[in-house]
Amino acid sequence: MSQSTATYINVIGAGLAGSEAAYQIAKRGIPVKLYEMRGVKATPQHKTTNFAELVCSNSFRGDSLTNAVGLLKEEMRRLDSIIMRNGEANRVPAGGAMAVDREGYAKSVTAELENHPLIEVIRDEITEIPNDAITVIATGPLTSDALAEKIHAVNGGDGFYFYDAAAPIIDKSTIDMSKVYLKSRYDKGEAAYLNCPMTKEEFMAFHEALTTAEEAPLNSFEKEKYFEGCMPIEVMAKRGIKTMLYGPMKPVGLEYPDDYTGPRDGEFKTPYAVVQLRQDNAAGSLYNIVGFQTHLKWGEQKRVFQMIPGLENAEFVRYGVMHRNSYMDSPNLLTETFQSRSNPNLLFAGQMTGVEGYVESAASGLVAGINAARLFKREEALIFPQTTAIGSLPHYVTHADSKHFQPMNVNFGIIKELEGPRIRDKKERYEAIASRALADLDTCLASL
């Protein structure tokens, strides 16, 4: 598609991603038409008409550079993020986390955007994708059905999902490899799964813990269609003692290897039950627990899933979640700049791209906004280094395995590994990754 000749850029949606995108475009001297339907049409989850409203929590999570989201926030500060700047101005005490007065914060973001001379705020619902100008779509996880259909169509009728059913993801380096074995079911293809075998006694204890664990409460806007399309592992377990044995914990075709020396039931060659772990990123540093989408509270997930042999000390880089969510098959549909592969004048940002979390959503809006502005000015696209948090997140969501793609929080597992011998002390390793990230970001910005 040819370059747009319009004298402005559209941004649809004034949540965290859309607000950030609009600001980044306007600060580069380009007029913005910012559309927001709240004020004309309410949503089930928002309480106000303010921009960048925080719906479920007032926390932007950890602020330390030894925390991946802390690193991402520092990178965003260096990129003049409107979300970070107004968040800082409205901070409330929260220990090592960054929490904000959500009303004061949202009002200040709204006021800054509404008073910006290059931003025209239009309170209206958009049901068609504009084709008059470069457009950033940032309509959030509960995109209206009408617009969702248009996004579905513009992407060839593929790759727009309505339920986020994500299994937990763990750091491979924290798996006890002496208790697991590499094998694919029936030895089909290459050995692609790490298998965590259970004896009958281990399975029964695990089943009891799983069926009695505390679930997270549902939001009112998630209840109606919550169980369509997928089933939480705890619900499956409650349907019968053996239900999981015919589902994600099926042991058939996963015989013990000849050199296996761990516990087993008598002389059986096959475990009573098996939990499979599947590689989640190209670097092989992250693995997800296959079929374990769940709505347990995070503390309960840690307690129960660490009963799985080999995962006793596992670190969870993302806990399982289940909620209604509209997100795209970004690996097939988007470039690393969040542009549509089929229409480069169309960009997406926010949770619909497969990033998970307030900070991550704002970061995606920052990347999309910068690149929309560069596209408008006919400048080369800006792809941040994979050694940075703000570079690794777009890279992950646009390069993940499409077949198993699920929304992702920022974490050190998706950032390019350090060169040289692995630093064993985790805090020192994360400090080194953060130091390299900020240096590489500064170098990138200096070259612009």
UniProtKB/Swiss-Prot annotation:
It comes from the Bacteria. GO terms for molecular function: flavin adenine dinucleotide binding; tRNA (uracil(54)-C5)-methyltransferase activity, 5,10-methylenetetrahydrofolate-dependent. Its main location: cytoplasm. GO terms for cellular component: cytosol. GO terms for biological process: tRNA methylation; tRNA wobble uridine modification. InterPro entries: FAD/NAD-bd_sf (IPR036188), MnmG-rel (IPR002218), MnmG-rel_CS (IPR020595), MnmG_N (IPR040131), TrmFO (IPR004417). Belongs to the MnmG family. TrmFO subfamily. This is Methylenetetrahydrofolate--tRNA-(uracil-5-)-methyltransferase TrmFO. It comes from Streptococcus pyogenes serotype M3 (strain ATCC BAA-595 / MGAS315). The gene is trmFO.
